[in-house]
Curated annotation (Swiss-Prot):
Belongs to the class I-like SAM-binding methyltransferase superfamily. MenG/UbiE family. This is Demethylmenaquinone methyltransferase. The lineage of its organism: Bacteria, Pseudomonadati, Bacteroidota, Bacteroidia, Bacteroidales. It is an enzyme of class 2 (transferase). It comes from Bacteroides fragilis (strain ATCC 25285 / DSM 2151 / CCUG 4856 / JCM 11019 / LMG 10263 / NCTC 9343 / Onslow / VPI 2553 / EN-2). It catalyses: a 2-demethylmenaquinol + S-adenosyl-L-methionine = a menaquinol + S-adenosyl-L-homocysteine + H(+). HAMAP family: MenG_UbiE_methyltr. Pfam families: Ubie_methyltran. The keyword ATP-binding does not apply. Methyltransferase required for the conversion of demethylmenaquinol (DMKH2) to menaquinol (MKH2). Coiled coil: none annotated.
């Protein structure tokens, strides 16, 4: 299927979305962590912790963190879940280079590694991972169905998928407040701190366009996942999706 956010690109209507997303994240990588925590008022840390807590009972030993960015989720997951191996994948080397430095400082280089991967065409073997996580990156996929299908392929039978994604609140007054915040505050702060005039206009557009709630639950189910559930966090600003292969 085609989804509205797949047509939204950071810089130009011409060219591949994945290449423009890679360029965008390479550009904003140095300022990304500061911006992320500032724009979410630090609440993003609690969202990550909720996602990781859901995985704890399953004790996954081989984990892939898709769209790993600067490695925040990977580092927290490694501390909390104590896996044998965690591979962070992303299309942006700029983001992963920041992540590599953070992992080194945490003393986790033997457990966490990074690999440049396009999630619509992963290089890993079938049934490779016990768990796959995606935090705030799935709406940037050039092809959502392909990305989910590839994650399904490399996940072991009985393995678990966890997705965190920013969503649009659907109730008054948070819906109205979030609209103002995403249209004015996010682009203004983004331009100021990242020096990229397009990135933080693109991101709110993709949040609004991305399928959410029951619609996203059905998208995940269609590629083969079972026991698909979702939970809205912080008045619907973020949604946690969980599924099993």
């Amino acid at each position: 299927m085609n989804y509205p956010q797949e047509k939204i690109k950071p810089y130009s209507n011409d060219g591949k979305k994945s290449e423009q997303v890679e360029q965008m994240f390479d550009n904003i990588a140095p300022a990304y962590d500061q911006l992320n925590h500032t724009l979410s008022l630090g609440i993003d840390r609690s969202w990550r912790r909720k996602a990781i807590n859901w995985l704890k009972p399953f004790r996954p030993q081989q984990i892939m963190d898709v769209a790993t960015g600067t490695g925040d989720f990977a580092i927290l997951a490694c501390h909390e879940l104590q896996p044998e191996q965690l591979i962070g994948t992303d299309i942006s080397e700029g983001m992963m280079n920041v992540g590599r430095e953070k992992v080194k400082k945490e003393g986790l280089s033997e457990k966490i590694s990074f690999a440049r991967e396009d999630c619509t065409s992963l290089s890993f073997a079938d049934n490779r991972f016990d768990a796959i996580t995606v935090a705030f990156g799935i709406r940037n996929f050039e092809d959502l169905d392909k990305g989910l299908s590839e994650m399904y392929r490399v996940l072991k039978t009985g393995g678990h998928l966890v997705i965190l994604e920013l969503t649009t609140p659907d109730r008054f007054p948070m819906k109205q407040m979030f609209t103002i915040y995403s249209k004015i505050v996010i682009p203004t702060l983004g331009k100021l701190l990242s020096k990229d005039n397009s990135a933080y206009s693109y991101l709110p557009q993709t949040i609004k366009a991305f399928p959410q709630g029951e619609v996203m639950k059905n998208v995940i189910s269609r590629v083969g996942f079972s026991q698909v559930q979702f939970r809205r966090l912080t008045f619907g600003i973020c949604t946690l999706y969980t599924a099993t292969k």
